[in-house]
Amino acid sequence: MRTLLIVLVLCSMSILNAQQLNVVTYNVRNSNPNDAKAGNGWEQRCPVLTQLITFHDFDIFGAQEVKHNQLEDMLNALPQYSYIGVGRDDGKTKGEYAPIFYRK
């Protein structure tokens, strides 16, 4: 019975009006001082990343290896987004985040 119900729900979903949702995930790479020495520091990557997100107009995007300062930079550059997530070390701001950003 449960399987039949699931099949009916899935079939009925195809009748509903579909809406496109643009979703992506991106490994930001943490803010590492050695990257800056090699010319690939966060200061160089942030504008490229935020321009890419703005250009593609993502509805939702996930990010990995995000330090708090990087999160703040992304939010400042992308005011049309908010996020859900916490730093993994203390459940607040310490450690890397894996935030999910969504359009406000």
Predicted segments, located by residue:
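Bacterial Sec-dependent N-terminal signal peptides
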Residues: 1-21
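A well-ordered secondary-structure block
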Residues: 97-104
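Serine/threonine-rich low-complexity intrinsically disordered regions
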Residues: 1-2, 32, 103
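N-terminal, active-site-proximal structural segment of metallo-dependent hydrolase catalytic domains
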Residues: 16-78, 88-97
